[in-house]
Swiss-Prot record:
InterPro entries: Adenylosuccin_syn_GTP-bd, Adenylosuccin_syn_Lys_AS, Adenylosuccinate_synth_dom1, Adenylosuccinate_synth_dom2, Adenylosuccinate_synth_dom3, Adenylosuccinate_synthetase, AdSS_1_vert, P-loop_NTPase. GO terms for molecular function: adenylosuccinate synthase activity; GTP binding; magnesium ion binding. It is found in: Cytoplasm. SMART domains: Adenylsucc_synt. Homodimer. The keyword Transferase does not apply. Belongs to the adenylosuccinate synthetase family. Pathway: Purine metabolism; AMP biosynthesis via de novo pathway; AMP from IMP: step 1/2. This is Adenylosuccinate synthetase isozyme 1 B. Its EC number is 6.3.4.4. Coiled coil: none annotated. It comes from Xenopus laevis (African clawed frog).
């Protein structure tokens, strides 16, 4: 992982009158881990590997709608809002300005993980003062909007009802409340809180808001988080331009859930592609180093929306059962299908992956043959792009390559040579098709079952 410093070699030759021009130093670079499908690819596991020797681990977007499970020494930790690097006692965890924070959720998550052995997290967590606050009424509105969508269109987005969408809506309409507002003049904050609550009540007549109760709770949380809050821009600038440091950015959600590039409208409300790293932390693009894409060896999706390689048959059921495919945040069953290299290529176009992590390869161990989606056809013609429109995406026919299964247990593999030849061929096929090397292969739940290839 790149903790190196780079300088821009526009050399400092003397200009007119012998004046020595300053030389721009790029500073440290951040390593980024992003989901390359519809989420649940196993990003937490890759982050966990890299977090062990990172100095700073950051979250740049999303909220507690994300769900990461990390297994350490047989204990399962569940993280939603915390960077999963919080379990590294030597690292600082940073929640950036692009994240939306539900304070009761933050402390509930801390309590649950403290019971499993997480210690001194409050000494290692830093929160950007520019991050927006998810209020309890944002969560209530999330549920009401979903009911409304169901009634009007007979379909819902499948939101986690964590208030993420309504909070980003408040942010975009410039009525949102930020951590810095909560920590300054509380009377001013209270007035703005009441205005926002009344705005939502005028839209949803059945929305009940205990204004005084919520403000009382927020005042209590304000004092609890005050020691953790910093100016995030200065914090990141110092981290990039101080001594050499390994900085890791943990993406939440995934490319196909991105508000701009995902399968809109069945997406989340933030940019979960690489651009969200710069806007969600306040760092320049030249400080982005390696970008690792995490992809499952098959494809899953939670909730409704187009899913070209979905298998509503025995193959899909087998993947769901063997892969234990239900959500960390919602407990909902995930829809399952074959690996789709069209969406992976599309995610690479946007993110510029420097390497991939291919997870859950072992789930395919029992299959006689494995299909891989390699191209889309629309009205019988191959198309060279990923369609933006949902109706068109529903009509797509997938062109498959059929590969022989390896029919043997890979869960004990710890290096490349331990993998069956046909499994190696599957990995090579993905690499060749996308033009990006696979750096890790996952064959089980534990940290040890991530095989590092280079």
């Amino acid at each position: 992982m790149s903790g190196t410093r780079a300088s821009n070699d526009r050399s400092s030759h003397p200009g007119a009158g012998g004046h020595k021009r300053p030389r721009y130093d790029v500073g440290n670079k951040v390593t980024v881990v992003l989901g390359a499908q519809w989420g649940d690819e196993g990003k937490g596991k890759v982050v966990d590997l890299l977090a062990m020797d990172s100095d700073i681990i950051c979250r740049c977007q999303g909220g507690n709608n994300a769900g990461h499970t990390v297994v350490v020494e047989g204990k399962e930790y569940d993280f939603h809002l915390f960077p999963s690097g919080i379990i590294n006692p030597k690292a600082i965890s940073f929640i950036g300005n692009g994240v939306v924070i539900h304070l009761p959720g933050l402390f509930e998550e801390a309590d649950k993980n403290e019971k499993k052995g997480l210690k001194d997290w409050e000494k290692r967590l830093i929160i950007s003062d520019r991050a927006h606050i998810v209020c309890d009424f944002h969560q209530a509105v999330d549920g009401l909007q979903e009911v409304q969508r169901q009634a009007q269109e007979g379909k819902n987005i499948g939101t986690t009802k964590k208030g993420i969408g309504p909070t980003y809506s408040s942010k975009a309409s410039r009525t949102g409340l930020r951590i810095c507002d909560l920590l300054s003049d509380f009377d001013e904050f209270s007035a703005r809180f009441k205005n926002l609550a009344h705005q939502y009540q005028s839209m949803f007549s059945n929305l009940e808001v205990d204004v005084d109760g919520q403000l009382k709770k927020l005042k209590m949380y304000a004092e609890k988080i005050r020691p953790m809050v910093r100016d995030g821009v200065y914090f990141m600038y110092d981290a990039l331009h101080g001594s050499p440091k390994k900085i890791l950015v943990e993406g939440a959600n995934a490319a196909l859930l991105d508000i701009d590039f995902g399968t809109y409208p069945f997406v989340t409300s933030s940019n979960c592609t690489v651009g969200g790293v710069c806007t969600g932390l306040g760092i320049p693009p030249q400080n982005v180093g390696n970008v690792y894409g995490v992809v499952k060896a098959y494809t899953t999706r939670v909730g409704i929306g187009a899913f070209p390689t979905e298998q509503i048959n025995e193959s899909g059921t087998l993947l769901q059962t063997r892969g234990h495919e239900w959500g960390v945040t919602t407990g909902r069953k995930r829809r399952c299908g074959w690996l789709d290299l069209v969406i992976l290529r599309y995610a690479h176009m946007i993110n510029g992956f420097t390497a991939l992590a291919l997870t859950k390869l072992d789930i395919l161990d029992v299959l006689d043959e494995i299909k891989v989606g390699v191209a889309y056809r629309l009205n019988g013609k191959r198309i060279p792009y990923f369609p933006a429109n949902q109706e068109i995406l529903q009509k797509i026919e997938v062109e498959y390559e059929v590969m022989p299964g390896w029919k043997s247990d890979t869960t004990g593999a710890r290096k490349w040579d331990d993998l069956p030849t046909k499994a190696q061929n599957y990995i090579r096929f993905v690499e060749t098709h996308i033009g990006v090397p696979v750096k890790w292969v996952g064959v089980g739940k534990s940290r040890e079952s991530m095989i590092e290839l280079f």
